[in-house]
């Protein structure tokens, strides 16, 4: 099964695709979509949508997940991040995918073992869980971590459903 993870941002959106067979994870591809800050906001959002649509068409994921947005003290930045996240959610929904959403601390805990992990720890564990992966950057590593988290949660939910049906 192919999982796509997204770490949305207006300046840089990370994406990562993995395949899961049983309990084995394999890297398919990862990348970062960048938009030019000198462009109009609407144009940047349109470019983000087009790039995400191309990633989805290219890798044909069956499951997808997006990292939730954390607010910060700059309301304008938080709003723009929310708009980029909306484009990510829309792009996945447009492709007919159901979408998991995870708080960054949940992703860190699932991949590193602690919700307070830093970016370098996340990158190191993603590299360990997906041997041979060449990370396109920190946002791509975060996106792969989101995909891994969703794969774990999906496997747990499937196992639970099987146990409930068997009882």
Swiss-Prot record:
It catalyses: Endonucleolytic cleavage at a junction such as a reciprocal single-stranded crossover between two homologous DNA duplexes (Holliday junction). Its main location: cytoplasm. Mg(2+) 1 binds at residues 7, 139. Its EC number is 3.1.21.10. Binds 2 Mg(2+) ion per subunit. GO terms for cellular component: cytoplasm; Holliday junction resolvase complex. It comes from the Bacteria. GO terms for biological process: DNA recombination; DNA repair. Keywords: Cytoplasm, DNA damage, DNA recombination, DNA repair, DNA-binding, Endonuclease, Hydrolase, Magnesium, Metal-binding, Nuclease. Belongs to the RuvC family. NCBIfam families: ruvC. Homodimer which binds Holliday junction (HJ) DNA. The HJ becomes 2-fold symmetrical on binding to RuvC with unstacked arms; it has a different conformation from HJ DNA in complex with RuvA. In the full resolvosome a probable DNA-RuvA(4)-RuvB(12)-RuvC(2) complex forms which resolves the HJ. This is Crossover junction endodeoxyribonuclease RuvC. The gene is ruvC.
């Amino acid at each position: 099964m192919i999982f796509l993870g997204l770490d949305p941002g207006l300046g840089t959106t990370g994406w990562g695709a993995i395949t899961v067979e049983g309990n084995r994870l394999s890297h398919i591809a990862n990348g970062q979509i960048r938009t030019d800050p000198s462009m109009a906001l609407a144009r940047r959002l349109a470019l983000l949508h087009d790039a995400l649509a191309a990633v989805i068409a290219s890798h044909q994921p069956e499951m997808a997940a997006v990292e939730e947005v954390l607010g910060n003290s700059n309301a304008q930045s938080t709003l723009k991040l929310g708009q980029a996240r909306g484009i990510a959610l829309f792009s996945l929904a447009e492709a007919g995918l159901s979408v998991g959403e995870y708080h960054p601390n949940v992703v860190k805990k699932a991949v590193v073992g602690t919700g307070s992990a830093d970016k370098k720890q996340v990158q190191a564990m993603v590299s360990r869980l997906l041997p041979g992966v060449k990370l396109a950057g920190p946002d791509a590593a975060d996106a792969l971590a989101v995909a891994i988290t969703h794969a774990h949660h999906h496997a747990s939910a499937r196992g639970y459903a099987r146990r409930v049906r068997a009882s």
